[in-house]
């Protein structure tokens, strides 16, 4: 355990605690991560744009992350229109993860809670005004996982 006053920088670290503290976070660096476009918090297009800027994030492997600007209100009250979603590039999600998913022949992209039940996947919005999307059978062949949402940032 690292004392609170050391974590807050009120006291210098010493002995074994200092080595543990440094090693625990040494793989994480604050990096500029590209904001590559927008994603619907609803059901719609996943739009990638060339130059949307950069945001800082503290991650282990910055080349495997990107930010998207959230559009829509289906993930309210936890994720709002205009928030930034930090996404880790990966093609699998665990049950209950928030993910950026592309679904359908038109390649509609969305940010939703991923729920797997038996042989179906449910894309769950937090906002009760929106319905869940249930994907099953051969429809699952048209579901692509772009990544896992690991953090969101609100802009004020």
Q: What are the roles of these predicted feature ranges?
A:
Residues 137-147:
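Short glycine/proline-enriched turn or capping motifs at secondary-structure junctions
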Residues 5-81, 95, 105, 109, ...:
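Short, positionally conserved secondary-structure boundary motifs
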Residues 128-139:
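Low-complexity, intrinsically disordered Gly/Pro/Thr-rich segments
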Residues 123-125:
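SH3/SH3-like beta-barrel fold
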Residues 84, 111-113, 134:
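Well-ordered beta-strand positions in beta-sheet-rich domains
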């Amino acid at each position: 355990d690292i004392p609170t006053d050391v974590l807050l920088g009120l006291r210098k670290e010493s002995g074994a605690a200092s080595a543990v503290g440094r090693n625990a976070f040494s793989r994480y660096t604050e990096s500029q991560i590209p904001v590559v476009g927008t994603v619907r918090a609803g059901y719609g297009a996943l739009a990638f744009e060339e130059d949307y800027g950069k945001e800082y994030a503290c991650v282990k492997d910055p080349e495997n992350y990107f930010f998207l600007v959230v559009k829509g209100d289906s993930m309210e009250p936890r994720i709002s229109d205009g928030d930034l979603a930090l996404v880790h590039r990966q093609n699998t999600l665990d049950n209950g993860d928030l993910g950026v998913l592309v679904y359908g022949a038109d390649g509609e992209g969305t940010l939703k809670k991923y729920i797997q039940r038996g042989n179906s996947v449910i894309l769950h919005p937090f906002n009760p005004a929106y319905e869940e999307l249930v994907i099953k059978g051969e429809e699952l062949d048209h579901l692509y996982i772009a990544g896992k949402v690991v953090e969101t940032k609100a802009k004020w």
